């Protein structure tokens, strides 16, 4: 079991990049929480630098990592340049030849497989990479000022989250297991027993179900 600190970039009075009202801080928080959820469901320990839209300074982020310790620090961001001028995913590390580079390559490949243009793994002097004691990566999940990247981010959100989690688990020699048997608390499965043109037949079937302990309801549908 590994310990991951998941860092959702920006937040609070720092929205990060903004494009057409869309805030980087919101996108990455939602993604960070889902990645952490997947890792926890796969037996990993997860801490977050933030779990809501609040301000967390760079020094607070690195201090949190150094105080709590972890096997890997994963910072999630979205990129920006000029509207529609650049697109793709890139993952940053502080130096080559490290376990952070191994993790970065795994995660970056997973996101390329989702459909992002590959902007490769890059060495960068970012604070959260430089000032953290343990292996750290910073993922730029597409450009927030590129409409095709935003479309991919929205339509493939779960695939993106699973890709990041899968890359993290592969670094630990494990495979991601995702259960499709349960949904969130606001979603339910509905069992449909049959459709009838005659109302009396529908009621007979409803009574049969009730007689063996299955409550049911009658719904009238109209073909459009």
Spans of model-derived segments:
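Short, Lys/Arg-enriched, disordered terminal segments
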Residues: 1-2, 224
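Short glycine-rich His-centered loop
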Residues: 2-21
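Short acidic, gly/pro-rich beta-turn/loop elements at beta-sheet edges
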Residues: 16, 101, 148-149, 201-203
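Generic anion/oxyanion-binding catalytic loop in active/binding sites
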Residues: 17, 54, 190-191
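Periplasmic OmpA-like peptidoglycan-binding domain that tethers envelope proteins to the cell wall
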Residues: 18-25, 196-199
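Solvent-exposed beta-strand motifs enriched in subsets of small alpha/beta binding domains
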Residues: 177-224
């Amino acid at each position: 079991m590994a310990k991951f600190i998941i860092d959702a970039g920006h937040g609070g009075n720092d929205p990060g990049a903004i494009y057409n009202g869309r805030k980087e801080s919101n996108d990455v928080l939602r993604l960070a929480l889902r990645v952490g959820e997947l890792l926890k469901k796969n037996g990993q320990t997860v801490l977050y630098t933030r779990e809501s839209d609040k301000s967390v300074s760079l020094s607070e982020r690195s201090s949190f990592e150094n105080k709590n310790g972890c096997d890997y620090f994963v910072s999630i961001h979205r990129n920006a340049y000029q509207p529609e001028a650049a697109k793709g995913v890139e993952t940053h590390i502080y130096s080559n030849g490290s376990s952070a580079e191994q993790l970065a390559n795994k995660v970056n490949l997973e996101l390329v497989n989702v459909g992002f243009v590959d902007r490769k793994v890059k060495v960068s002097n970012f604070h959260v990479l430089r000032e953290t004691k343990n292996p750290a990566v910073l993922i730029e999940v597409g450009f927030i000022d590129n409409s095709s990247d935003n479309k991919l981010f929205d339509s493939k959100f779960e695939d993106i989250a699973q890709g990041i989690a899968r890359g993290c688990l592969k670094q630990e020699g494990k495979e991601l297991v995702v259960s499709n048997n349960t949904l969130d608390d606001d979603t339910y499965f509905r069992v449909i027993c049959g459709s009838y043109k005659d109302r009396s037949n529908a009621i007979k079937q409803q009574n049969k179900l009730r007689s063996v302990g299955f409550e049911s309801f009658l719904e009238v549908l109209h073909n459009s």
